[in-house]
């Protein structure tokens, strides 16, 4: 994404070390030259006395003299300027030994930080003995649990019990795992069935792993009219880098956990749609491309202390995963046979696909080879695309991102009439559907415009004929953007004002990263009236979307309302609303509405900075505030 190499991609580590060695060599050479000059008795040049000119018509010693002006700079001033320049630029100086030592120390520390980021987790925190469990897809009557256990604690007995406000129910046996081996990296999915809808359960394993989950509501029940879930993409442990943090800590997951805790249990998401780049095999350094190397990366992420927090671990939220390029290689478009895809697919299948939702009703492919998924939860159905496994090279007339089987399955899903009460169709893509990003566009749907148009045509038809709303969710970009795609049949009667901002059409919300970097370079802009820009939020190292659906009334008519809330670094900064009538009517769907926007509020941004500083600095911040108040008093 963005470029040929991801930041901080694998070219950067050797460049940093090479630059340090060159820098230290130049320091050594400069010091050696200075010593040689000192040994040869070389003295620094001194300033000459000012020359005197005789005045016009002068005749002797007593004649008037004029002195040419000269500027004298003391050696102390020269040293001070040189020291400042050395500290500012990092260049060595012969005029100030302390400044040179300081700048050398800073450069060595920065290089050591780079080595620490690359190697500390690899060397000091081995992951082969990771024992871990998490919740996968949960339906109204079943749940999937992922478990990894390499420590010979077999067999593993699985039990579960109902939890309510009156106490825990009687433990029920769900089965036993008798063997785990290296063929699956000591992992296995566990299926629990026969559950009650809309119920909280605790699962327990005999290897001391446990967790909780909530089953989905029964279709057609009052609870099935509501839904809340979250969506994001892209995580890299301990990046942006913090030297005193655990090398596997995922700062964005910590922010997500604390944000959800503040929202309360009533606003708990039913699941997380994580849209790719769960690992970065080539960031900051690709150690290899074997199955072992890819498995190592998954284990490092799951070894993070960010998963092990109380009272409610993020591992208790059902994480549903799709594949993107950094689980394979940057901007991957070489199919599912070319190396390193087979090695990359191994841990993805074991760690994620094994507990993902079921495959579509008609996948048009062999079930064991299908890595796209579909499910229904309450008022919404979902289709999770695989945009990497089947894609061809972009920018050709017949370029395909999905492959023929997945494309056919998706078209059938879009035009399939949903059961009563299901008013939303969500389609997830690991890369943006819009072509408004102007860097790396061929890696997005902008490189597959013919296939994109075929899908948009089907979506417009579904909204016109089926009375459902189609929403696109995507990731990959370390930025947020909301875009809409107006139906050309309806747009022909639109006013020029409708070709910007909120309005009608298929809507896409692209959010990321959950825990990565962002760039100060602006790369998203509207260029035509096909992709209408609604909102662009590039800043923030942690972004996720919270999507909520509930019934509402508009002008006396009962509707299903979806709110998309964007959270940046733990704070809600933007909210957008879409509605669809509960009673099917053959008419255009209402336009989207902006509910909240404080992204460009400098007062709000400054308030957020001060609150963050106050929280992090504690006593130091209070001292700063006190000193500031005293300075104001003195100024008065």
Cite the ranges covered by each PLM segment.
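Metal-dependent phosphoester/phosphodiester hydrolase catalytic core
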Residues: 1-636
């Amino acid at each position: 994404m963005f470029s040929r190499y991801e930041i901080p991609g694998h070219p950067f580590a050797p460049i940093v070390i090479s630059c340090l060695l060159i820098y230290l060599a130049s320091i050594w050479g400069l010091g050696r030259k200075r010593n040689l000059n000192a040994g040869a008795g070389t003295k620094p040049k001194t300033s000459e006395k000012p020359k005197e000119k005789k005045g016009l018509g002068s005749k002797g010693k007593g004649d008037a003299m004029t002195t040419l002006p000269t500027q004298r700079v003391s050696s102390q001033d020269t040293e001070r300027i040189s020291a400042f320049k050395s500290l500012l630029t990092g260049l060595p100086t012969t005029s100030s030994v302390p400044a040179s030592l300081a700048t050398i120390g800073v450069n060595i520390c920065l290089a050591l930080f780079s080595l620490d980021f690359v190697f500390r987790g690899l060397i000091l925190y081995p992951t082969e003995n990771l024992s871990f469990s998490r919740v996968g897809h949960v339906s109204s009557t079943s749940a999937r649990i992922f478990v990894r256990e390499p420590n010979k604690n077999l067999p593993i007995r699985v039990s579960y019990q109902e939890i309510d406000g009156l106490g825990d129910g009687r433990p029920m046996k769900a089965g036993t795992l008798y063997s785990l081996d290296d063929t699956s990296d000591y992992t296995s999915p566990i299926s629990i069935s026969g559950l009650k809808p809309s119920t909280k359960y605790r699962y327990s394993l005999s290897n001391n792993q446990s967790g909780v989950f909530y089953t989905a509501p029964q279709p057609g029940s009052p609870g099935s009219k509501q839904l809340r879930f979250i969506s994001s993409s892209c995580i890299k442990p301990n990046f942006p880098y913090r030297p005193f943090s655990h090398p596997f800590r995922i700062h964005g997951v910590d922010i997500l956990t604390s944000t959800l805790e503040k929202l309360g249990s009533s606003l708990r998401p039913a699941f997380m749609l994580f849209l790719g780049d769960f690992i970065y095999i080539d960031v900051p350094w690709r150690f290899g491309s074997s199955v072992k190397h890819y498995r190592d990366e998954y284990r490092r992420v799951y070894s993070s202390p960010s998963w092990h927090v109380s009272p409610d671990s993020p591992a208790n939220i059902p994480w549903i995963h799709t594949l993107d390029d950094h689980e394979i290689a940057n901007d991957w478009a070489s199919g599912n046979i070319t190396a390193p895809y087979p090695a990359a697919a191994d841990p993805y299948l074991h760690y994620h696909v094994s507990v993902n939702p079921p495959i579509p009703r008609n996948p048009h492919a062999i079930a064991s080879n299908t890595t796209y998924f579909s499910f229904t939860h309450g008022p919404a159905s979902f289709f999770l695309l695989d945009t990497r496994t089947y894609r061809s090279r972009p920018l050709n007339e017949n370029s395909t991102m999905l492959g023929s089987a997945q494309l056919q399955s998706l078209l059938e899903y879009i035009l399939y009439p949903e059961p009563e009460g299901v008013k939303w169709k969500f389609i997830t893509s690991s890369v943006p559907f819009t072509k408004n990003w102007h860097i790396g566009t061929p890696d997005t749907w902008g490189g597959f415009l013919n296939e994109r148009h075929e899908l948009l045509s089907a979506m417009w038809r579904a909204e016109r004929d089926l009375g459902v709303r189609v929403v696109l969710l995507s990731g990959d970009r370390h930025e947020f953007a909301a875009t809409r795609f107006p139906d050309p049949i309806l747009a022909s009667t639109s006013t020029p004002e409708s070709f910007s901002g909120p309005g009608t059409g298929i809507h896409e919300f692209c959010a990321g990263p959950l825990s990565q970097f962002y760039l100060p370079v602006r790369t998203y802009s509207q260029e035509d009236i096909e992709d209408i820009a609604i909102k662009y939020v590039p800043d923030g190292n942690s972004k996720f979307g919270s999507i909520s659906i509930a019934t509402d009334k508009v002008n006396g008519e009962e509707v299903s309302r979806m709110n998309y809330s964007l959270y940046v670094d733990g704070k809600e900064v933007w909210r957008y609303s879409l509605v669809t009538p509960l009673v099917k009517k053959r008419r255009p769907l209402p336009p989207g509405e902006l509910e909240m926007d404080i992204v460009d509020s400098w007062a709000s941004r400054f308030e957020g900075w001060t609150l963050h500083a106050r929280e992090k600095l504690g006593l130091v911040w209070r001292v700063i505030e006190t000193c500031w108040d005293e300075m104001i008093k003195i100024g008065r």
